UniProtKB/Swiss-Prot annotation:
Gene: MT-CYB
Species of the source: Miniopterus fraterculus
GO cellular component: mitochondrial inner membrane; respiratory chain complex III
Protein residues bound to heme b b566: H97, H196
Binding site for heme b b562: H83, H182
Protein name: Cytochrome b
Family statement drawn from the similarity comment of this UniProt entry: Belongs to the cytochrome b family.
GO biological process: mitochondrial electron transport, ubiquinol to cytochrome c
Cofactor(s) the protein needs: heme b
């Protein structure tokens, strides 16, 4: 009798993806973040589902319904904070996952990389709409400022913004549709994740050396299932520590004030995971230019495979490229810091220099340094 694991139409798909999958024998903990993102998505969908059972998407009651969840619903407070801080964990894992792909040259798997960029955009859109739902001051003004950026699009901009708002300002219609999309998008993301994995399993995983490892593959289970389980444990412990000891650490105090269209907060800023892009947006003193820079700051990832000039895939044996990579990381941290600061001297010029350097490293310096390294290695 054949093993049901290998013969059942449905189970054999799971088997070929999670059990008998041939995996490189040398992938490090940097390859754990894919599965951690899967856990984050599951946590977000589950906590979000239970929150949606008690939340009301109406401008008059949204803020109070979130307060009601925290005060009156059994374990509502932990659901709310798991969901809010789970989003932060999601983005930490996302950025580390993308950084790993950049460092080890995983972007050469172009289909997987491109669907990954679409996933990044989808997660960012979901997080933005989720931030609007509690209907605090930063929710309202964040929604107003970010949606208003679309008015910079020539000719159709104003009509587009009013169409998204469902009126002439951010109001009840906006909140209702944001809730609808915020509920729907994670399931679309889950479907896109399946496609992401489908493309990945067509080619197999990359590894730290960047050299094909087909001749030295090991089964995913038990080796990487146990390794992933350790990752889950560490991440869930970190998330629970954040939720139980300092749940508001990454939030904005302004969001504990109900939304008031007549009172603008002194500093409108998004959640910490968007600050680097927000800093790039603000660094250009022109609305359309800023919006283009904002979109390009993420979209630039799509042309990285075309800019790969090195004869080696990974940066493991390329020390000069490594220096540039870590300069890019430091630059992104600088942009994140600048995004949270007021628009005044010296933050303006620091933000502008960091924004220029961000695009310079990716578009000019990395390809040039790769060519130089080829020359130094006589390739």
């Amino acid at each position: 009798m054949t093993n049901i694991r290998k013969s059942h139409p449905l189970i054999k798909i799971i088997n070929s993806s999670l059990v008998d999958l041939p995996a490189p024998s040398n992938i490090s903990s940097w390859w754990n973040f894919g599965s951690l993102l899967g856990v984050c998505l599951a946590i977000q969908i589950l906590t979000g589902l239970f929150l949606a059972m008690h939340y009301t998407a109406d401008t008059a009651t949204a803020f109070n319904s979130v307060t009601h969840i925290c005060r009156d619903v059994n374990y509502g407070w932990i659901l709310r904070y798991l969901h809010a801080n789970g989003a932060s964990m999601f983005f930490i894992c996302l950025y580390l996952h993308v950084g790993r792909g950049l460092y080890y040259g995983s972007y050469t798997l172009t289909e997987t990389w491109n669907i990954g960029i679409l996933l990044l955009f989808a997660v960012m859109a979901t997080a933005f709409m989720g931030y609007v739902l509690p209907w605090g001051q930063m929710s309202f003004w964040g929604a107003t400022v970010i949606t208003n950026l679309l008015s910079a699009i020539p000719y159709i901009g104003t009509d587009l913004v009013e169409w998204i708002w469902g009126g002439f300002s951010v109001d009840k219609a906006t909140l209702t549709r944001f809730f609808a999309f915020h509920f729907l998008l994670p399931f679309i993301i889950a479907a896109m994740v399946m496609v992401h994995l489908l493309f990945l399993h067509e080619t197999g995983s990359n590894n730290p050396t960047g050299i094909p490892s087909d001749m030295d593959a090991i089964p995913f289970h038990p080796y990487y299932t146990i390794k992933d389980a350790l990752g889950f444990l560490i991440m869930i412990m970190a998330l629970l520590t954040l939720v139980l000891f300092s749940p508001d650490l990454l939030g904005d105090p302004d969001n504990y004030t109900p939304a008031n269209p007549l009172n603008t907060p002194p500093h409108i800023k998004p959640e910490w995971y968007f600050l680097f892009a927000y800093a790039i947006l603000r660094s250009i003193p022109n609305k359309l230019g800023g919006v283009l820079a904002l979109v390009l700051s993420i979209l630039v990832l799509a042309i990285i495979p075309l800019l790969h000039t090195s004869k080696q895939r990974s940066m493991t044996f390329r020390p000069i490229s490594q220096c540039l990579f870590w300069l890019l990381v430091a630059n992104l941290l600088t942009l994140t810091w600048i995004g949270g600061q007021p628009v005044e001297h010296p933050y303006i010029i620091i933000g502008q220099l960091a924004s220029i350097l961000y695009f310079m490293i990716i578009l000019i310096l990395m390809p040039l340094v790769s060519i130089m390294e080829n020359y130094l290695l006589k390739w």
